[in-house]
Amino acid sequence: MREKLKLYYLCRFTQLSPLRLSGGKNDRTDNDLMLDSRGLPMIPGSALAGVLRSRLTREDADLLFGKNTVGNDMTESAVLVGDAALPAGAKVRFTHRDGVGLDERKIAIPKAKYDFETAECSVPYTAVIEWSGWSDDPALPLLDALLAGAAADGLAFGGRTTRGYGRMAADVCKKAFHFPADVDAWLAFDSDDVNSFADATPVVG
């Protein structure tokens, strides 16, 4: 039977290598990390969505995340991707590293040295991804498969990922609410509280 659904995926990302995700500022280095209001590194939802979208074909990405066009061809995403944040009090090691600009032949450019900031933390970053739609929506199996693949392969965020930066292991679990049967449980659910996912179903690849 066709049902209205709301799905919540709790994603935990554990660093396997230093993170270099620029916030566009250069107060501390030539390329500062993106930090939240608490001064902790974060992965914005737009960056997480972009990494996930890149794992799909264009057709599947448009179906799941909407079309990035204008006018009548634009479609809205059924997926809401939250920021991946560290818990309060997480201990982070910040490091300033040196780099050098390269030309098109990968040869160092004279006087093109720069520095950038990286972060290392053993505590997982946590993000929530929300999906709303009907049980027969063709985008639904795409999202499950996408996040199962992320859990199996891990993801990489930020700059210099081809050099090994930003690699993270992913652990994903899911809470599903069927309407109208689960309306009371959904009203009592708090997606911002990780304890609300205590009985969530693991998403595995």
Residue ranges and their predicted role:
Residues M1-G205:
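Small/polar/charged residue-enriched interaction surfaces, especially the RNA/DNA-contacting tracks
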